[in-house]
Amino acid sequence: MLDIRLIREQPDMVKAALGRAGVDPAQVDAVLAYDEQRRALLREVEKLKALRNAVSKEIGKMSDAGERDTKIAEMRAVGDRIAALDRELAAVEERQYAALMELRNLPHPAVPDGPDETYNVVIAQEGEPRAFDFAPKPHWELGEALDIIDFERGVKLSGSRFYVLKGLGARLQRALIQWMLDLHIQQGYHEVYTPFVVKEQCMWGARQLPKFRDNLYRDVEDDLWLVPTAEVPVTNLHRDEILEADQLPLRYCAYTPCFRREKMSAGRDVRGIKRGHQFDKVEMYMFVHPDTSYDELEKLRADAEATCRLLGLTFRTKELCTGDLGFAATRTYDIEVWAPGQGEWLEVSSCSNVEAFQARAANIRYRSAPGARPEYVHTLNGSGLGLPRTLIAIMENYQQADGSIIIPDVLRPYMGGAEVIRRS
């Protein structure tokens, strides 16, 4: 969430920055209006409390019983007024908090302007799309022909946008997860294995709520939410904590399945496994000192790019424009791999700096020195990488004319030395 002091002290700057991302300035005005109401109520409450305290001291010195009783009755009325104002204050604070939570993060000044993804800027590309001497097939045809993806039984089990991985297909997915975790540990991340369901407070802390409520799965009976990304539980590992400066940076990697209703993507990517209600992802996450967060963003990007490189995939990196930037992000790099069977680039990693946006909501702070006033950390997140799109890219790039799929070298030790996937 944004700093209310920043909004109060620099409203024009905040409106201009949010305007670059298409935010109506009226949303900022609403937050400021609630803030003024809250401050006015606080002033009135403090004034009445000061009056009550002063008169209470006088009452103790009064010798006239009638005068004392009169003052006591007056102070009871003052107390009732304070209680009523406190209730009004709580209601205004709740409305202000709700309005504040609707505001997205401020785009970094260096982020390119643009209304949508067509204005994203390609800043790097490594490799060229493979030249085939046959027509490459899309992964859904390869998967069915090799009997490693079963769409029909996925639908039978759970409905549309579900599938079953079988045999070496399932093993390839597991190999990718294990290899990516091992790689990120080598890159300096600490592995954690978290719950896949979390309390609602975790969703607010990671800023998934209220923005993405309709895209999330929830267990209503126990009031638990299925994670849409490992970013949610990992953010909340240090919720309501004060870290010491010498603990930073904290870098974590985590595997979770991810659950999304995909209501925002209805009708898109209905073939294959590109977009499902359940998918696997390895996440990289950082808690860092504010002074180093943009250096850490470059590390995050480099680590995600290295993952693509080691898999032998052609990839490119884009900087997202203001209109495509995620709700919580100040700056984001998307890394895309080429999928020749579909003839398109697939996003497998999105690396973002969110500065203090999540930390303020989750109350995650650090102390720069003993006795110093705690300040909010900066947090960053990046996919390292997302499945099944990485699986798609491997299947389509490593396919052979006979329909088999060569297994990338780095994954073979995780697959018992298997070198190729053929129909058994």
Swiss-Prot record:
Its main location: cytoplasm. InterPro entries: aa-tRNA-synt_IIb, aa-tRNA-synth_II, aa-tRNA-synth_II/BPL/LPL, Ser-tRNA-ligase_type_1, Ser-tRNA-synth_1_N, SerRS_1_N_sf, SerRS_core, tRNA-bd_arm. Pathway: Aminoacyl-tRNA biosynthesis; selenocysteinyl-tRNA(Sec) biosynthesis; L-seryl-tRNA(Sec) from L-serine and tRNA(Sec): step 1/1. ATP binds at R260, R261, E262, E347, V348, S349, S350. Keywords: Aminoacyl-tRNA synthetase, ATP-binding, Cytoplasm, Ligase, Nucleotide-binding, Protein biosynthesis. GO terms for cellular component: cytoplasm. It catalyses: tRNA(Ser) + L-serine + ATP = L-seryl-tRNA(Ser) + AMP + diphosphate + H(+); tRNA(Sec) + L-serine + ATP = L-seryl-tRNA(Sec) + AMP + diphosphate + H(+). It is found in: Cytoplasm. Disulfide bonds: none annotated. The keyword Repeat does not apply. Its EC number is 6.1.1.11. Pfam families: Seryl_tRNA_N, tRNA-synt_2b. L-serine binds at T229, A230, E231, E283, S383. GO terms for biological process: selenocysteine biosynthetic process; seryl-tRNA aminoacylation. Catalyzes the attachment of serine to tRNA(Ser). Is also able to aminoacylate tRNA(Sec) with serine, to form the misacylated tRNA L-seryl-tRNA(Sec), which will be further converted into selenocysteinyl-tRNA(Sec). HAMAP family: Ser_tRNA_synth_type1 (MF_00176). Belongs to the class-II aminoacyl-tRNA synthetase family. Type-1 seryl-tRNA synthetase subfamily. Homodimer. The tRNA molecule binds across the dimer. Consists of two distinct domains, a catalytic core and a N-terminal extension that is involved in tRNA binding. This is Serine--tRNA ligase.
